[in-house]
């Protein structure tokens, strides 16, 4: 073994950083067993879980993916360059834990959850954190003899080239400075694998927050609910939550069951029993209704919709267009996505009606019919699918569009019916239920859509207007929602008078008396509150980042925002960190790739699409293929440095 140790630094040790570390260990075992390699892991929180999945968070916070569809390990489906070294999914780990096959002592709460956990159960985030910490420990314990892993419980604040390259003509090695003053030197490669990061507010947001402070009101900015101090919210106090997505459900849980309330069933109906410590919650958003519930999983851990139209051949044709000739999402991609979703809906509807024998012939006929033409209507008529059962994207995205509300009571009555219907649809499953089977196609097609839109696959105007501002929020609303249990709980809280949904197109202002909100579509909906919670995560924004490392890299020209060419030859600048295609080398302000720096994950959103999605087993997870590519490149930098030094010494 070489006596000089070569080093890689991984900054950010949540699931993505963990995956890179695991892939580095696997690659070193196969390709460099005689080369001493040190892996520095930099994260102020325990590696594996990181901050978001830390084990100390409230047990009232749930994941929105079932246990059988969560992993951090490679499997036979993953198209790897490096070696395959499989490991258990979260559900398989829970089973092994109960069987006594997982070493270590775990709290009773963890063991109790493992006993209750099925493959289609939504685990707590803390439970996932225990799995991730175990996965890190397993990776370190099983690392080849040539690899040592060192955790630095601190935050990286600077990344620089070393002043002198050790070998002539070789790029300088790297130096990382930590918040506690420690300096990591002579690094052959650095991987940025951070997650959601704090961001400065926009000018409009800061003006609003300043007004709130001036009048002495409590304004809680966008944040992970697990990181938010809620002691300032008093029992019985009116509190306004702006946002009805996943963060809203987290706050809803923390302020109700998290304060001692409970749910029970009375004649089959869920009822909330208050503790008396809850605030009075008012909530709203532009769309005005909570995210759609996930359909109960009937696909097992690995099942997914196989593309009918977004096939590899079609994707290859779309990928051939780049830059100013990039694809147009609305013209080239959306019709294919919509057609796939609608086809699955109608096919499942026929099967649910007992006409499964006609489903295949329907699919062939419907796929041949051009979208939005009378040919589609003819097919639907031929298969006796009436108007009331026909797919309507507008009605799905704005389910209240045909309603008129005379009062908040009218809106609440309609909303409760809507929520109960959503729960019933979710209970029917993501294979058997026509609606949820169709909406699950949006989730299953994420990898295919990424292949088209990533790295400037769309022209800039389409990326901004069609993908960022239209499809991404629609996709989140329809397919990245909470478990059905959360929707049922929201309905019970509304009936208990603890939660009030204000209505669509939420308007909020602030004055000396407090925060005021109303829906222009719901007469009499104006409410006032003393506390406003922004129920969303901070923006993914490089230009306004408060992460000290990215801030310094940006200010010094060592990184840049991703840009996309428009049809008229100009650029649209996004808020994502600019990187090359795989292996995602960091680009500087002059758009030059750095041969020793790599970045992937949430901060690169807009280069990549939906970067927050987790690793799923059995479906060739893009996160695993990405981390494998980075690990191969980082190991390549190590071996190149080793060979160069050996040549110099000779």
Swiss-Prot record:
> Oxidoreductase as a keyword?
yes
Q: What class of enzyme is it?
A: oxidoreductase
Q: Which Pfam families match?
A: NAD_binding_9
Which Enzyme Commission number(s) are listed? 1.14.13.248
**InterPro entries recorded for this chain?**
FAD/NAD-bd_sf, HpyO/CreE_NAD-binding, L-asp_N-monooxygenase_NS-form
Specify whether Oxidoreductase is a keyword of the entry: yes
| Cofactor(s) in the UniProt record | FAD
A single GO molecular function term of this UniProt record: monooxygenase activity
Q: Which family would the database say this protein is a member of? A: Belongs to the nitrosuccinic acid synthase family.
Q: What does this protein do?
A: Involved in the biosynthesis of desferrioxamine derivatives which have iron-binding properties and may act as siderophores. Catalyzes the iterative oxidation of L-aspartic acid to nitrosuccinic acid (2-nitrobutanedioate) via N-hydroxyaspartic acid and nitrososuccinic acid.
**The protein's name:** L-aspartate N-monooxygenase (nitrosuccinate-forming)
């Amino acid at each position: 073994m070489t006596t000089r140790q070569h080093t890689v630094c991984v900054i950010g040790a949540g699931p993505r950083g963990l995956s890179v570390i695991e892939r580095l260990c696997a690659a070193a075992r196969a390709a460099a067993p005689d080369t001493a390699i040190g892996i520095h892991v930099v994260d102020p929180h325990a590696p594996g879980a990181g901050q978001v999945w830390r084990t100390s968070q409230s047990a009232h916070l749930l994941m929105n993916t079932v246990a059988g569809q969560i992993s951090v390990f490679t499997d036979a489906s993953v198209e790897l360059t490096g070696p395959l070294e499989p490991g258990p999914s979260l559900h398989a780990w829970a089973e092994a834990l109960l069987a006594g096959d997982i070493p270590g002592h775990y709290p009773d709460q963890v063991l109790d959850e493992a006993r209750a956990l099925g493959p289609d159960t939504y685990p707590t985030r803390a439970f996932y954190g225990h799995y991730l910490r175990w996965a890190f420990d397993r990776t370190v314990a099983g690392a080849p003899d040539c690899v040592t892993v060192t955790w630095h419980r601190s935050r990286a604040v600077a990344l620089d080239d070393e002043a002198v390259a050790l070998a002539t003509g070789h790029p300088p090695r790297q130096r990382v400075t930590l918040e506690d003053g420690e300096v990591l030197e002579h690094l052959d490669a650095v991987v940025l694998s951070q997650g959601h990061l704090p961001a400065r507010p926009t000018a409009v947001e800061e003006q609003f927050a300043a007004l709130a402070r001036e009048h002495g009101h409590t304004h809680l900015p966008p944040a992970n609910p697990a990181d938010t101090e809620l002691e300032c919210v008093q029992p019985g106090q009116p509190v306004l939550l702006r946002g009805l997505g996943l963060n809203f459900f987290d706050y809803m849980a923390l302020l109700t069951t998290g304060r001692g309330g409970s749910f029970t069933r009375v004649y089959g109906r869920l009822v909330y029993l208050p503790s008396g410590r809850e605030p009075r919650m008012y909530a709203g958003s532009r769309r005005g209704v909570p995210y759609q519930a996930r359909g109960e999983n009937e696909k097992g851990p690995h099942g997914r919709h196989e593309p009918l139209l977004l096939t590899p051949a079609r994707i290859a044709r779309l990928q051939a267009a780049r830059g100013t000739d990039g694809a147009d999402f609305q013209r080239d991609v959306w019709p294919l996505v919509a057609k796939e979703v609608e086809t699955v809906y109608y096919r499942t509807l026929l099967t649910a009606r007992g006409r499964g024998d006609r489903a295949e012939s329907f699919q062939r006929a419907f796929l041949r019919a051009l979208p939005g033409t009378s040919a589609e209507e003819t097919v639907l008529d031929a298969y006796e699918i009436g108007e009331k059962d026909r797919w309507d994207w507008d009605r799905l995205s704005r389910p209240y569009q045909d309603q008129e509300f005379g009062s908040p009571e009218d809106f609440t009555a309609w909303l409760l019916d809507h929520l109960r219907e959503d729960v019933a649809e979710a209970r029917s499953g993501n294979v058997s239920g026509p609606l949820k089977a169709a909406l699950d196609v949006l989730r299953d097609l994420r990898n295919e859509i990424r292949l088209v839109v990533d790295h400037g696959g769309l022209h800039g105007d389409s990326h901004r207007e069609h993908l960022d501002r239209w499809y991404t929020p629609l996709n989140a609303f329809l397919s990245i929602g909470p478990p059905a249990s959360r929707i049922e709980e929201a309905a019970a809280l509304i009936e208990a008078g603890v939660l009030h949904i204000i209505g669509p197109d939420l308007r909020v202002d602030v004055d000396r008396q407090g925060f005021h909100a109303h829906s222009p579509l719901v007469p009499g909906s104006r409410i006032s509150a003393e506390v406003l919670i922004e129920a969303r995560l901070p923006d993914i924004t490089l230009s306004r980042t408060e992460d000290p490392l990215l801030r310094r890299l940006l200010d010094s020209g060592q990184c840049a925002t991703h840009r996309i060419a428009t049809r008229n030859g100009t650029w649209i600048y996004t808020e994502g960190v600019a990187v090359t295609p795989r292996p995602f080398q960091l680009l500087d302000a002059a758009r030059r790739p750095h041969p020793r720096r790599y970045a992937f994950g949430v901060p690169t959103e807009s280069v990549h699409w939906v970067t927050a999605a987790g690793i799923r087993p059995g479906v060739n997870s893009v996160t695993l293929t990405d981390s494998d590519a980075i690990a191969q490149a980082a190991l390549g930098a190590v071996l190149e440095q080793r060979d160069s030094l050996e040549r110099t010494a000779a």
